[in-house]
C-alpha cells in the first residue's frame, strides 16, 4: 500500500449499520439511487447558496447531477458540482455515525409495518440520515472522490463496507463529488439507462437541480422535470403529484394526512406547500428537533435551518418560497430579518388554523384523534414554549379521561363540569393503564368528578404553564384533595370514620423527614394510603421527573394521606392506641403509597420482607387478637 494511503477502521456502529441496511432493505434496493441523487442535489444547492456571499464558489454553468453507467467496468457513477468535501469531511461524514442513531435505526427496522401491514422499511433510510450507506446494497466497493469548494486538494474515500475505509490524495479539476459504485453481480439492472431513468422519475422528478443520465455513446438525457411544484396552481396538480412530492421531502412512504398549498399575497408574498404526515416517523419525533420545512427564494433553495415553524410543529414537512428576501442574505442575517419573522408568523397561523378546523369536524373526529396519537406529544410542547400561542393550542389537545371511553378535549371537559366544581382536574403518570387504576382517582370517582389522564413526558410540564382554560384553573389531583370536601360523594353516605389522632401522631414521628405531614382523607375508597403533593411546589409526577434527571427537588416532602375506613388503618390505629411501636409499619405504609404512585420503595429489600411477612400472616395477628 502506498505511504500516502491511510487506512481507518469504521466506528463500531457503522459496521452494524451497513449490515442492517444491506440485509434488511435488500428487496427495495432502488432507493439507493434516490438517496445518492438527493445528497448530490443538496450539495449543489448548498454551494449555490454559499456562492451568493462568496463569488469564488460560483457554480459552473452546466451544474447538474450526472448519472453515468459503464457496462464494461460494471460501475455506476453519480457526479455533482456541489459544495464537495475535504479530507476531514469525508472521514467525519462517511466514516462515523452516532451510536444512538444506529440503535434507533435497528429498533425501527423491527417495527416498520404500516397500519395495513405494508412494509415501511425503505422510508427509514432517509429519516435516519444514513442514505449514503444504501450504496452497499448494490455495490461491493464504493469510492468517493471529492474536492471542497474553495479548496485546492481532492481526496478519495474507498471501502468495501466490511469494517474499514481508506483515504488518499486524488485529482479533481473542479469542486464537487464523484461516487463510483462497483456493482455486485446481481445489480446489472442499474447499468441500464432506461432502468435508471425510471427510478429517477419515480423518486426525484421534483428535485430542482437538473439530473442527467449519460448513455453508452456518451449522450446525456434529462431525467427529471425539475419543476417547482409549489409554484403551479392547485388546479393543475393531481393528488398523485402531491403525494409524490410529499414522499420526496419527507422520505416517507405514507400519504399526507393534510396538504396545505396556498399563496399569500399583499404586503407579504410567499407560497407554501406543507404536509402533515399520516404516520408517526420511526425516529421519535420528540427527539428529532430538526426543521422539516425548506426555505426557497425565487425557487432557489436557501436553507432548511430557517426555523419557519416553531419546534412544536416540527412534524410538518414542506417548502416555503418567497420573492421578498434577497438571494445573497447570509444564514446568520436571515434569522433576524423582519420579513422572515413575518413569514414565520403567517405560516404558523396557517398550520394552526388547519388543525383547528379539522379538530372541530365532528364527522371526522376519529381522523383527528389519529393525528393526535401521532403528534400530540409534540403539539403539547407549544403550551410550554409558546406563550403567545397557548390559547390557540389548548383547544387542539386531546386527552384520555377517567369517565369518557375515548378522547376528549378541554372545551368538552368544561362543558361537563359539575356546577360546584371549581377546577379542571388531571393526573400524570407514565402510562394510561397505571392512571386508570390509580388510588389518586378514588375520591374523584366517588363524587362523579372527571379527571384527565396524562401520560406523555411533556404532560408534567405544560399544565402549570397554561394555568387556566376558560377561567377554570388546571389542578393536579395530587394537589387538589382539599377540593373534594366541597363535593358530595354520589350514592350512599359513607360510615363515620374513627378518630385517628394517636396513629397520625405516631406516623408523623416515624416518617419525618420523608413526609411533610400525615393526615386523614376522605378521597380514598378502596386504598389504605395515598401520597399528595404539599400546597407549594410541583405535583408528584414533576418531582419524580426531576429526581430521575438528577436535578433533585428542594421543595417540601409529600404528604401521606390515610383512609380512616380501611381495615389496615383501623388495625394500625388500635395498635397505636395500645402504645405499640409502629416505626416499621409506618415505613411500609409510605413505601406502599410510593409503589401505588409508580415510584420505587425507599428500601426495596425491606419492603419485600414486609410484604412477605404480611402474606405469612405475621402482620395480621395483632389485628385478630384486638
Curated annotation (Swiss-Prot):
Single GO MF descriptor: ATP binding
PROSITE patterns: HSP90
Residue span of region A: 1-331
Domain of life: Bacteria
Pfam families: HATPase_c_3, HSP90
Transmembrane feature ranges: none
Function: Molecular chaperone. Has ATPase activity.
Name used for this protein in its record: Chaperone protein HtpG
Organism: Methylorubrum populi (strain ATCC BAA-705 / NCIMB 13946 / BJ001) (Methylobacterium populi)
Protein's gene: htpG
Amino acid at each position: 500500500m502506498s505511504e500516502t494511503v491511510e487506512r481507518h477502521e469504521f466506528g463500531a456502529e457503522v459496521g452494524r449499520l451497513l449490515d442492517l441496511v444491506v440485509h434488511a432493505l435488500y428487496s427495495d434496493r432502488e432507493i439507493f439511487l434516490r438517496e445518492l441523487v438527493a445528497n448530490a442535489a443538496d450539495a449543489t444547492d448548498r454551494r449555490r447558496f454559499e456562492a451568493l456571499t462568496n463569488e469564488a464558489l460560483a457554480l459552473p454553468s452546466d451544474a447538474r447531477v450526472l448519472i453515468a453507467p459503464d457496462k464494461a467496468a460494471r460501475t455506476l457513477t453519480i457526479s455533482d458540482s456541489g459544495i464537495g468535501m475535504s479530507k476531514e469531511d469525508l472521514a467525519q461524514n462517511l466514516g462515523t455515525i452516532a451510536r444512538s442513531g444506529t440503535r434507533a435505526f435497528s429498533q425501527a427496522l423491527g417495527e416498520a409495518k404500516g397500519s395495513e401491514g405494508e412494509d415501511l422499511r425503505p422510508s427509514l433510510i432517509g429519516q435516519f440520515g444514513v442514505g449514503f450507506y444504501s450504496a452497499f446494497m448494490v455495490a461491493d466497493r464504493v469510492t468517493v472522490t471529492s474536492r471542497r469548494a474553495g479548496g485546492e486538494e481532492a481526496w478519495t474515500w474507498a471501502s468495501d463496507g466490511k469494517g474499514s475505509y481508506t483515504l488518499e490524495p486524488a485529482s479533481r479539476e473542479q469542486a464537487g463529488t464523484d461516487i463510483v459504485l462497483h456493482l455486485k453481480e446481481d445489480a446489472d439492472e442499474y447499468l441500464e439507462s432506461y432502468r435508471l431513468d425510471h427510478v429517477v422519475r419515480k423518486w426525484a422528478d421534483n428535485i430542482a437541480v437538473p439530473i442527467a443520465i449519460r448513455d453508452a455513446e456518451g449522450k446525456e438525457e434529462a431525467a427529471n422535470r425539475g419543476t417547482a411544484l409549489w409554484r403551479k396552481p392547485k388546479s393543475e396538480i393531481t393528488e398523485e403529484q402531491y403525494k409524490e412530492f410529499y414522499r420526496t421531502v419527507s422520505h416517507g412512504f405514507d400519504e399526507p394526512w393534510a396538504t396545505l398549498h396556498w399563496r399569500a399575497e399583499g404586503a407579504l408574498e410567499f407560497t407554501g406547500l406543507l404536509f402533515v404526515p399520516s404516520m408517526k416517523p420511526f425516529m421519535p419525533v420528540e427527539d428529532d428537533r430538526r426543521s422539516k420545512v425548506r426555505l426557497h427564494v425565487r425557487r432557489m433553495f436557501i436553507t432548511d435551518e430557517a426555523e419557519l415553524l416553531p419546534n412544536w410543529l416540527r412534524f410538518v414537512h414542506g417548502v416555503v418560497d418567497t420573492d421578498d428576501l434577497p438571494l445573497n442574505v447570509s444564514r446568520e442575517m436571515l434569522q433576524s430579518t423582519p420579513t422572515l419573522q413575518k413569514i414565520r408568523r403567517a405560516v404558523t397561523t396557517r398550520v394552526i388554523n388547519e388543525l383547528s378546523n379539522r379538530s372541530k369536524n365532528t364527522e371526522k373526529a376519529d381522523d383527528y384523534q389519529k393525528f393526535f396519537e401521532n403528534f400530540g406529544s409534540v403539539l403539547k410542547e407549544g403550551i410550554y414554549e409558546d406563550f403567545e400561542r397557548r390559547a390557540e393550542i389548548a383547544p387542539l389537545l386531546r386527552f384520555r379521561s377517567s369517565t369518557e371511553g375515548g378522547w376528549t378535549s378541554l372545551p368538552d371537559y368544561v362543558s361537563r363540569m359539575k356546577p360546584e366544581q371549581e377546577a379542571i382536574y388531571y393526573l400524570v403518570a407514565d402510562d394510561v393503564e397505571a392512571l386508570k387504576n390509580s388510588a389518586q382517582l378514588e375520591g374523584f370517582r366517588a363524587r362523579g368528578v372527571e379527571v384527565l389522564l396524562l401520560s406523555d413526558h411533556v404532560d408534567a410540564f405544560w399544565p402549570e404553564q397554561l394555568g387556566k382554560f376558560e377561567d377554570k384553573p388546571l389542578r393536579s389531583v395530587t394537589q387538589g384533595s382539599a377540593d373534594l370536601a366541597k363535593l358530595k360523594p354520589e350514592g350512599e353516605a359513607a360510615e363515620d370514620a374513627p378518630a385517628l389522632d394517636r396513629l397520625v401522631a405516631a406516623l408523623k414521628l416515624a416518617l419525618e423527614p420523608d413526609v411533610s405531614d400525615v393526615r386523614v382523607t376522605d378521597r380514598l375508597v378502596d386504598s389504605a394510603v395515598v401520597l399528595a403533593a404539599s400546597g407549594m411546589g410541583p405535583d408528584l409526577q414533576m418531582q419524580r421527573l426531576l429526581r430521575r434527571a438528577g436535578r433533585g427537588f428542594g421543595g417540601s416532602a409529600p404528604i401521606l394521606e390515610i383512609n380512616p375506613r380501611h381495615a389496615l388503618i383501623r388495625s394500625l390505629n388500635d395498635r397505636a392506641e395500645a402504645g405499640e411501636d409502629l416505626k416499621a409499619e409506618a415505613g411500609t405504609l409510605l413505601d406502599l403509597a410510593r409503589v401505588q404512585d409508580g415510584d420505587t420503595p425507599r428500601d426495596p429489600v425491606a419492603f419485600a420482607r414486609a410484604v412477605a411477612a404480611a402474606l405469612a400472616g405475621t402482620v395480621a395477628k395483632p389485628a385478630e387478637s384486638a
